[in-house]
Swiss-Prot record:
Identification of the protein by name: Cell division topological specificity factor
Lineage start: Bacteria, Pseudomonadati, Pseudomonadota, Betaproteobacteria, Burkholderiales
Isomerase in keyword set: no
Biological process, per Gene Ontology: cell division; regulation of division septum assembly
Gene designation: minE
Function: Prevents the cell division inhibition by proteins MinC and MinD at internal division sites while permitting inhibition at polar sites. This ensures cell division at the proper site by restricting the formation of a division septum at the midpoint of the long axis of the cell.
Entry keyword set: Cell cycle, Cell division
HAMAP family: MinE (MF_00262)
The species this protein was found in: Burkholderia cenocepacia (strain ATCC BAA-245 / DSM 16553 / LMG 16656 / NCTC 13227 / J2315 / CF5610) (Burkholderia cepacia (strain J2315))
Pfam families in alphabetical order: MinE (PF03776)
Family to which this protein belongs: Belongs to the MinE family.
Length: 84
């Protein structure tokens, strides 16, 4: 980190913010040991909002799911992007 960026502050990119949020959600769920919270619809809505800035998609074009198998959790995001 340079001194100039430290003094002026540096804006985080939306991708890194989204990545941090996903990591926090998954870590929280692992520690809790309980069934997944109902954050998936909100996560899906936020993803649609971010992707819509660049490509026209609807809520039906994205699927978010969380699966648990033994001690492994898989967050799966499927996005259908229309042909240009």
């Amino acid at each position: 980190m340079s001194i100039l960026s430290f003094l002026l502050g540096e804006k985080k990119k939306s991708a890194s913010v989204a990545k941090e949020r996903l990591q926090l959600i998954i870590a929280h769920e692992r520690v809790g040991g309980r069934p997944p919270a109902d954050y998936l619809p909100a996560l899906q809505k936020e993803l649609v909002a971010v992707i819509s800035k660049y490509v026209h998609i609807s809520n039906d074009d994205i699927r978010v799911s969380l699966e648990r198998q033994d001690d492994l959790e898989v967050l799966e995001v499927k996005i259908e992007i229309p042909q240009a």
